Design a protein with these regions (language model features):
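Active-site phosphate/pyrophosphate-binding segments
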Residues: 2-179
């Protein structure tokens, strides 16, 4: 039993429970209670993908997150793409003008990005109650949907291009393609 417990790795908010179950303390990674779902990707929750892709890839991922944070904090508003995109989203959806947003990556490597952003944005922002418990007076989240642009050209892209309703759409392309 003890030998078996040495081969388990646990990621949990309740590491004390893992210890009671016999998991070696060095094999237990805590999820802090203040880490919300949208940020868990930068926490111990990413242990499985880190092991699958390597620590170097995870370190690069964290460095990318840090560079976006620094760009947001250190760039003037008129040159700040992150801030501008965020403000456009607020104007589009908080005003109730639009109810959905399409995410259209032009790379099959990013085929799951719309699904990830759907979970991230709609779970995080799709609430009718504010942090203080009061009701929100504005629309809180668009319906996020999309797919790889080249695969969608004869499906919903037809509606986006020739339909009667406007849908804010983010097209994601690359200056360099890596295979």
């Amino acid at each position: 039993d003890k030998k078996l417990a040495e081969h388990f790795v646990v990621v949990s908010a309740k590491t004390d429970q893992a210890a009671k179950a016999g998991v070696v303390a060095d094999n237990s990674f805590q999820i802090w209670p203040w880490v919300g779902g949208r940020y868990s990707i930068a926490s111990a929750m990413s242990l499985a993908p880190t092991l699958a892709f390597g620590f170097d890839v995870f370190t690069e991922f964290l460095a990318g997150m840090r560079s976006v944070d620094q760009q947001l904090q250190n760039t003037t508003p008129e040159n700040n793409a992150t801030l501008i995109l965020g403000l456009v989203d607020v104007l589009n959806f908080a005003t109730g003008r639009y109810s959905s947003q399409a995410i259209l990556p032009y790379s099959s490597a990013l085929r799951l990005l719309p699904n990830y952003l759907q979970q991230l944005i709609m779970e995080s922002n799709g609430k009718s109650v504010r942090q203080d418990g009061s009701d929100s007076e504005i629309s809180t989240s668009p319906v996020i949907w999309g797919g790889v642009g080249t695969n969608s050209q004869h499906a919903f892209m037809q509606m986006l291009h020739q339909g009667t309703q406007a849908v804010p759409s983010e097209f994601i392309g690359f200056a360099k393609i890596s295979n």
